[in-house]
């Protein structure tokens, strides 16, 4: 199994995702996703954990369930990611980081040039303690990227809606 990852790539690619001049309505949770959460004893407002497996090119969304533990909600195939297996260690290394990252509503961008996007908060506490550097590492839509993790618009819209309600 590949190392666990959270967002990655080139800072130039991710930070160029400025706000569009036209505001758009952010994606909302579908009734289907609400039913999936309910079936797994999860509430929409429960905390979220996102992890990405580089080798498998998969993004997982985990939420706290009624037991108070994180449980897997859904796995999504990724369109693109850059770098190689192994951790990100410094700003500008074009390497995707590997670790666990807590996503909060303040890290969401509903006006991304790539549909919607969110920052996964690299570096996490362990990476900071190790002296790893980097910022503005995103997951976004449009299934095209020169650095960040890219998903289809429908995938990132659903993930965005899950995170926004947390």
PLM feature segments, named:
Residues 2-10:
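Bacterial N-terminal signal peptides
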Residues 10-36:
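Bacterial Sec signal peptide processing site at the extreme N-terminus
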Residues 31-49, 61-63, 80-91, 98-105, ...:
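N-terminal post-signal-peptidase region of extra-cytosolic proteins
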Residues 51-53, 140:
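Well-ordered beta-strand positions
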Residues 65-81:
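Short Gly/aromatic-enriched secondary-structure transition segments
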Residues 92-166:
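Exported/periplasmic cell-wall-interacting domains
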């Amino acid at each position: 199994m590949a190392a666990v990852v959270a967002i990655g790539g080139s800072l130039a690619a991710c930070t160029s995702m400025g706000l569009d001049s036209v505001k758009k309505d952010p994606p909302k949770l579908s009734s289907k996703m609400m039913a999936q959460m309910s079936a797994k004893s999860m509430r929409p407002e429960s905390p979220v954990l996102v992890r990405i497996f580089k080798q498998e090119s998969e993004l997982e969304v985990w939420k706290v369930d009624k037991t108070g533990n994180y449980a897997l909600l859904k796995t999504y195939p990724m369109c693109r990611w850059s770098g190689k297996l192994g951790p990100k260690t410094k700003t500008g290394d074009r390497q995707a980081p590997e670790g666990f990252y807590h996503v909060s509503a303040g890290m969401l961008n509903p006006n991304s040039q790539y549909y919607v996007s969110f920052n996964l908060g690299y570096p996490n506490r362990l990476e900071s303690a190790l002296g790893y550097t980097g910022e503005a590492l995103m997951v976004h839509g449009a299934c095209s990227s020169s650095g960040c993790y890219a998903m289809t618009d429908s995938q990132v819209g659903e993930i965005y809606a899950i995170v926004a309600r947390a």
